[in-house]
């Protein structure tokens, strides 16, 4: 039996579109074992109990690369990461599948090979990298090779996820983005991405509200999320450090000072006045990333 734990992730972090991401302490667990024959799923809806399941697709990709053919598989899932909410559920499935397959096959692939394969399956590194490595990462793909650097985040900051009861697919969220951007908007985001990394690294938390601004994706996607701007405004009134759309949304992620004890209950009271139901969940940065059989990958 192979046990793999993968954290949720929040990508983009405001201006860092498709390159910044952070792992948080919300997890999916995967329990995988080879059996005599067949493919058995436990812990997921019936519609996902087939060969199109993303976990199995990722596992098969890994097995094919290694040249390993399992006789059969039992895959059990314990999921705490909500699907289609902008918290890296698909990245968690891909990473969990690839890591568990590699472990079943005797650990033939090294960490870099696993990471490159996961990005190949998922399509982009902003969620995959922090899910794999933990912490906050800045990532790019260069000729199909994943290049990344860990971002050191000063102590004293925490996150609060505002998770709605409605979903938003990544495909739909990408469809509203423009085909091209103005040069000045690119400069706007480049500067704020640099500021975000520096502010988090140096503990200049008062600068985060400026660094969260973006002109590439958030305003386009906000129209798909009812009450986004009123929620953002209320978060700012409650002395948040910064507010941004988590991944493609619809989850709204809030940065707070560690000592802030009142934000969660106050924003919850505000959210209860809205039509949709919102879950308020305080989170910390997960520093381990993916863990297999109680050891870091």
From Swiss-Prot:
Primary location group: cytoplasm
Highest taxon, organism lineage: Bacteria
Catalytic activity entry: L-homoserine + ATP = O-phospho-L-homoserine + ADP + H(+)
One biological process term in Gene Ontology: threonine biosynthetic process
PANTHER family noted in UniProt: HOMOSERINE KINASE, HOMOSERINE/4-DIPHOSPHOCYTIDYL-2-C-METHYL-D-ERYTHRITOL KINASE
One Gene Ontology CC term in the entry: cytoplasm
Protein name listed in UniProt: Homoserine kinase
Organism: Clostridium botulinum (strain Loch Maree / Type A3)
Disulfide-linked positions: none
UniProt keywords, alphabetically: Amino-acid biosynthesis, ATP-binding, Cytoplasm, Kinase, Nucleotide-binding, Threonine biosynthesis, Transferase
């Amino acid at each position: 039996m192979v046990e793999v734990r993968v954290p949720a992730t929040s990508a983009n972090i405001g201006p860092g579109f498709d390159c910044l991401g952070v792992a948080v302490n919300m997890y999916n667990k995967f329990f995988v074992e080879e059996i005599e024959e067949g493919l058995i799923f436990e812990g997921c809806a019936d519609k996902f109990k087939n060969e199109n399941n993303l976990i199995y697709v990722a596992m098969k990709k890994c097995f094919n690369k290694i040249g390993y053919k399992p006789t059969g598989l039992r895959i059990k899932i314990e999921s705490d990461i909500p699907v289609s909410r902008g918290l890296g559920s698909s990245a968690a499935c891909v990473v969990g599948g690839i890591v568990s397959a590699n472990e079943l096959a005797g650990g033939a692939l090294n960490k870099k090979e696993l990471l490159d394969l996961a990005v190949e399956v998922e399509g982009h590194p902003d969620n995959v990298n922090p899910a794999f490595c933990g912490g906050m990462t800045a990532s790019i793909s260069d000729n199909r090779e994943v290049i990344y650097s860990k971002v050191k985040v000063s102590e004293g900051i925490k996150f609060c996820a505002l998770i709605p009861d409605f979903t938003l697919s990544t495909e739909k969220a990408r469809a509203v983005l423009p085909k091209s951007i103005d040069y000045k908007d690119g400069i706007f985001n480049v500067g704020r991405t640099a500021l975000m990394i520096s502010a988090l690294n140096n503990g200049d938390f008062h600068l985060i509200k400026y660094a969260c601004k973006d002109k590439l994706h958030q305003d386009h996607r906000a129209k798909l999320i009812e009450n986004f701007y009123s929620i953002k405004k209320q978060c700012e009134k409650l002395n948040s450090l910064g507010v941004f759309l988590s991944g493609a949304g619809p989850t709204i992620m809030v940065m707070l000072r560690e000592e802030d004890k009142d934000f969660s209950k106050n924003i919850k009271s505000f959210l209860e006045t809205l039509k949709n139901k919102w879950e308020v969940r305080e989170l910390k940065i997960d520093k381990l990333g993916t863990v297999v059989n109680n050891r870091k990958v």
